[in-house]
Design a protein with these regions (language model features):
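A domain-start/cap signature at the N-terminus of enzymes
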Residues: 18-57, 65-89, 117-134, 153-158, ...
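Active-site glycine-rich loops that stabilize anionic/oxyanionic intermediates
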Residues: 62-66, 195
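Conserved alpha/beta-hydrolase
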Residues: 85-100
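Cap/lid segment of the alpha/beta-hydrolase catalytic domain
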Residues: 96-130, 262
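Conserved acidic catalytic loop of the alpha/beta-hydrolase fold
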Residues: 134-152
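The feature captures the conserved acid-bearing segment of alpha/beta-hydrolase catalytic domains
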Residues: 182-289
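C-terminal catalytic histidine-bearing segment of alpha/beta-hydrolase fold enzymes
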Residues: 250, 264, 281-324
Length: 324
């Protein structure tokens, strides 16, 4: 049985790898024009015209499969189940790579990244250069336009799996948006089932030999070799900003498979725990040791493993995304 299971996992890993190399089948239909190029994204409503009924915007970030439209639908379903579909705008950015652009004949105006570099906030490879995190900043800036969104009160940035990695690191490095404060628009982050987290010190929950894993404290796992997007901020400043932000960790109670095909099994990630659920608990414990008054929340979703749709549409997911 173990041999058969191993073969099945091998097939799953191969399929995921092939999907990444061959490009996505579905490219989101909308475009957000930025100076560096056009960002592919999906929208639940046309945000180019005023949306006077929208009080909340949900920016939902896909994982490494870059299936933004799947996440867009999960966000729409979660909002509808929570009874807030009418006043919620769902935005699903799509961080395409070079294979996606080639497969879908997208031309030279659509932003693209090398492989999965977008997860760590690296700049696009074309047509211009912009960090994936800076692209999120531009979405937030657009939402601060009171002519288009006169009733907006809250922006929620949520991501699952690879998208959870993006949201965690973006919450850590993300630039301030004074316009939101001026306009009374709050900003929250929901980090769901990421494979790893960025630590602020060399401390890790699992004993390991640093000599055999020299990159354990490099970005995206630690504070060494930070991306250009961070600018001149140091680790201490980043940590103080991060712990002050409104962050919820949404973890699947059954996301406990140490051999999951999409789990980061690098030595850098293994220092954080054996599987996603324990890695999440370990990280929050680490933060609470350093900041006893930490206001972050950890919410488990019973009976759910590594499934973005079930996480966000669950009663717990709805409550986190759309608190009444």
């Amino acid at each position: 049985m173990n041999k058969r299971l191993g073969l099945l996992l091998g097939v799953l890993v191969s399929c995921c790898t092939l999907a990444a190399e061959h490009g996505v089948k579905v490219v989101s239909p909308d475009r957000f024009h930025l100076e560096a190029g056009d960002l592919s994204l999906g929208l639940s409503q046309d945000w180019r015209q005023p949306l006077p009924k929208v009080t909340r915007a949900l920016i939902i970030v896909h994982g490494r499969l870059r299936n933004a439209q799947t996440y867009l639908q999960s966000g729409i379903d979660a909002a509808n189940h929570a009874g807030v579909g009418g006043d919620t705008l769902v935005i699903a950015p799509q961080f395409l790579n070079q294979a996606d652009v080639k497969r879908n004949h997208l031309g030279d105006q659509v932003l693209q990244w090398k492989a999965n570099d977008w997860m760590a906030g690296e700049p696009s490879t074309g047509p211009g250069h912009i960090s994936s995190y800076a692209a999120l900043d531009q979405i937030i800036k657009h939402l601060g336009n009171r002519t288009l969104f006169p009733a907006l009160k809250e922006i929620v940035i949520a991501g699952h799996s690879g998208g959870g990695q993006v949201v965690q690191r973006f919450a850590l490095t993300g630039h301030d948006h004074p316009l939101l404060q001026t306009e009374g628009i709050s900003l929250r982050y929901v980090v769901a089932n990421p494979s790893s987290y960025a630590y602020f010190s060399p401390q890790r929950p699992v004993p390991f030999d640093a000599a055999s894993c020299p990159g354990f404290n490099d970005w995206k796992y630690g504070m060494q070799k930070l991306p250009d997007y961070v600018g001149h901020q140091g680790a201490q400043q980043l940590e103080q900003t991060y712990v002050s932000r409104d962050i919820t960790y949404l973890l699947g109670e059954q996301d406990t498979d140490p051999n999951h095909p999409a789990l980061d099994k690098s030595c850098e990630a293994e220092t954080q725990g054996a599987y996603r659920l324990i890695r999440g608990h370990n990280y929050v414990d680490y933060l609470r040791q350093r900041h006893p008054q930490l206001g972050h929340r950890l919410v488990e979703v019973p009976g759910v493993g590594h499934d973005g749709d079930k996480m966000f549409t669950s009663p717990q997911g709805q409550k986190v995304l759309f608190p009444q």
